[in-house]
Design a protein with these regions (language model features):
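Bacterial N-terminal signal peptides
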Residues: 8-18
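Phosphate-group recognition and catalysis centered on beta-loop-alpha active-site segments
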Residues: 21-291
Length: 291
């Protein structure tokens, strides 16, 4: 075997050894997207959320803020679609309890012969005691019912009410509203805040277009974000794309809760983000080499 061949073999063996010794993504950094559905208990239901939190997984959950200051772990758009319109932020606790997450969109009458389990949106306070012992928990604020200053104050007040011993260190707030991230940082200086990115756009000049990493980095820096939760788009959100975000100083969540496709195990392994979304966390963990 000549010199170049020996060198190539040595490099190949070193790479293989590094891969074999590298730890898989930690369980707590694999984020169950809106929980882990169980039977007829759908995503965002209490059983689904508990399955993620009690299982040692991370969680990425959409949040609906209501004007009375409550926080429900469900997307505002989901609530509006089930009710066939309306502003989810205006619902009272009684009205929110009347929303069945198993309900077909706009169908308020199941019929006498149809049995469907009833699961209403879950208030943050119902799962708050489970969060400190879970993996990393990302709360994506899916609506902003008021000025960003008012909403930041609302979030601070609600956190102080439900987390009696202080906001858990494993809790992260996510938003696509830059001013809200800034205001949250002002209200709660120790709170981790991630910029929510859907790297697709449309305008009259470009038509449909994909947003490149430098633009995402520019925005996240302006918002003083700690990290970036980016929608996974195969062929666009590549390892090189993720690497640029990381080299700019941001932690990265691969996959955006409630938006687009979940990243594949191959994409997660190649990109090496700090966190990854999954509909089936156990399957992703196993595919990444976890036991």
């Amino acid at each position: 075997m000549n010199g170049p061949a020996r060198l190539a073999l040595a490099l190949s063996l070193a790479f293989a050894a590094a891969v074999a010794q590298s730890a898989p993504l930690a369980k707590g950094n694999i984020l169950a997207a809106n929980g882990i559905p169980k039977g007829e208990a759908p995503a965002s239901s209490l059983p689904a959320l508990k399955a993620a939190l009690n299982g040692g997984w991370g969680l990425a959950a959409n949040v609906t803020l209501t004007k009375d200051g409550r926080m429900y772990l469900v997307a505002a758009g989901t609530v509006s679609r089930i009710l066939k319109g309306g502003d989810a932020s205006k619902l009272t606790p009684e009205e929110m309890r009347g929303v069945n997450l198993n309900q077909r969109e706009g169908d308020l009458d199941f019929g006498d012969d149809e049995v469907v389990d009833y699961h209403s949106p879950v208030e943050l306070e119902k799962v708050a005691p489970l969060i400190p012992k879970a993996g990393t928990v990302f709360l994506h604020l899916s609506n902003v019912p008021g000025s960003t200053e008012a909403v930041a104050a609302m979030v601070k007040k609600r956190f102080s009410e439900v987390f009696k011993e202080g906001t858990p260190t494993n809790l992260v707030v996510v938003s696509n509203r830059g001013n809200l991230l800034i205001d949250l940082g002002r209200e709660m200086p120790g709170l981790k805040r991630f910029h929510y990115v859907v790297p697709r756009g449309h305008n009259k000049v470009k038509g449909d277009f994909l947003v490149e990493a430098p633009s995402v980095i520019y925005s996240a820096k302006g918002y003083k974000a700690d990290g970036i939760m980016v929608e996974y788009i195969a062929g666009h959100i590549t390892p090189a794309y993720v690497d640029k975000l990381k080299k700019a100083g941001f932690e990265v969540v691969l996959g955006a809760v409630g938006c687009g496709a979940m990243p594949t195990a191959d994409a997660v392994a190649a990109s090496a983000p700090e966190y990854a979304l999954a509909k089936d966390p156990a399957a992703l963990y196993k595919a990444l080499g976890g036991k």
